[in-house]
């Protein structure tokens, strides 16, 4: 609870002192990380608790919950719990950007075990999703060694021989097709 109250104070202070309400900044997305990368904000519910508190402090839904499929998949909440939270977050007008990223590997989107398609669809169906981004990590990047050491499976080579430019382009095409298909089907 103290981490939430400290973050609320900090973000409210920045919001007020920088006069963000009167700036061109329309929203501020908050992302949670998996346990080990963060200690407190490690699932969608905890992230939303923070965002709700910050928005209450400033009086309107400026802060948004960033939905990252990889972090949702790596958290202690199952798919259904994440779906239910996405629906509630959207109803409160606090749904932010969607990160299409594969749990654990952070590699080729096809290694997501269903998390990307399911959560992206749920976000789209709320009618509140404005942006979706593709996020892929280079599995052998030395800067990511601490993450590889943190979790089994992180940094596994899921490239199938492709370079990262091609993986990213494939990911963007995949997400564009998914979004187009959801639109065609009326969502």
Annotate each language-model stretch with its function.
Residues 9-13, 17, 41-187:
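Histidine-acidic metal/acid-base catalytic patches
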Residues 23-25, 36-38, 58-61:
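Short, charged helix-to-loop "capping" segments that act as catalytic/coupling loops
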Residues 1-34:
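Glycine/proline-rich, flexible active-site/cofactor-binding loop segments
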Residues 1-4, 31-40, 71-73, 107-108:
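Surface-exposed cleft-lining segments at the edges of enzyme active sites
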């Amino acid at each position: 609870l103290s981490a939430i109250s400290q973050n609320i104070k900090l973000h409210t202070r920045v919001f007020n002192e920088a006069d963000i309400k009167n700036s061109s900044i329309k929203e501020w997305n908050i992302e949670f990380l998996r346990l080990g990368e963060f200690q407190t904000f490690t699932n969608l519910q905890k992230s939303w608790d923070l965002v709700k508190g910050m928005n209450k402090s400033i009086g309107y839904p400026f802060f948004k919950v960033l939905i990252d499929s990889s972090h949702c998949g790596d958290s202690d909440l199952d798919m259904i719990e994440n779906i239910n939270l996405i629906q509630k977050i959207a109803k409160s007008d606090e749904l932010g950007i969607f990160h299409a990223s594969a749990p654990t590997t952070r590699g080729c989107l096809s290694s997501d075990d269903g998390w990307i398609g399911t959560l992206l669809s749920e976000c789209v169906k709320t009618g509140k999703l404005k942006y979706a981004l593709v996020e892929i990590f280079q599995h052998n990047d030395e800067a990511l060694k601490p993450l590889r050491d943190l979790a089994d499976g992180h940094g596994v080579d899921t490239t199938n021989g492709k370079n990262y430019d091609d993986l990213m382009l494939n990911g963007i095409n995949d997400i564009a097709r998914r979004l187009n298909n959801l639109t065609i089907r009326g969502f």
